[in-house]
């Protein structure tokens, strides 16, 4: 492995590119790989990601690289920033090139498709238990990270040394703070469920329900996230942090969120395909909705908001009817 490369980022979309830019600005030589060779070659030529992060110039220490084997041989620190539905596929791609020295982190927000398993379980299944694992999650929009605007995230993992090392790579005293969490499950889960609730917030606003309804939805969405997390062994208090409440509020209230905009379009009467085309990038919450629904039903946890969003997206339920069914539920203790 090369001595000078600090980390390789796998995933050259908006968020992967933004995190790579941030790492390089922190003084860490960084490689950036993506599955489309022509896209990486454009990044090499343009020294920016014009498609996803226009006008953000790459620092000198950031190098786009087309060869996956070269990227993995250059450093032991690997960061996956790919959609959750291809997370397992990318792990299978890199597995032949891994050595016992490698350490695997991800900033992917989601669960395994169909099963709803945590990505930690997916990684362990594919790679075995030898490799240290870590996750980075929190209230972050790619463009704001790329611009160097103040940002804070949570980092959690299977091994404290690696968790601390990843946190240190991102942390600086100017605009990027990292908070280390000891709750690996909570930090993984928050990023998936908040995407679903953000679609719901968009749906509510698209229907014209107003700020009261949006706030109620966020609050009850946090309750659903917490209930699911505790059932999986997470601590209730963990969901009040960056990867829980922080990410939930950001994604539900700002139109930089693809998930919120997707829900907004649906609430205004557009179809699923038309809404996805309008967004123009992956809407993680669409798949996350099915993942969370499957997980909650598998372990028997009631999540009425997520359930109604699932019915809208996957069973053609009318948006207004889903809203009415939520509003007509029997009163209950908070």
Curated annotation (Swiss-Prot):
Domain of life: Bacteria
Gene Ontology biological process: carbohydrate metabolic process; glycerol-3-phosphate biosynthetic process; glycerol-3-phosphate catabolic process; glycerophospholipid biosynthetic process
Enzyme class: oxidoreductase
Pfam families, alphabetized: NAD_Gly3P_dh_C (PF07479), NAD_Gly3P_dh_N (PF01210)
UniProt-listed Enzyme Commission number(s): 1.1.1.94
Residues binding NADPH, per UniProt: 14-15, 35, 109, 142, 258, 282, 284
Family named by the database record: Belongs to the NAD-dependent glycerol-3-phosphate dehydrogenase family.
UniProt function note: Catalyzes the reduction of the glycolytic intermediate dihydroxyacetone phosphate (DHAP) to sn-glycerol 3-phosphate (G3P), the key precursor for phospholipid synthesis.
Protein name per its UniProtKB record: Glycerol-3-phosphate dehydrogenase [NAD(P)+]
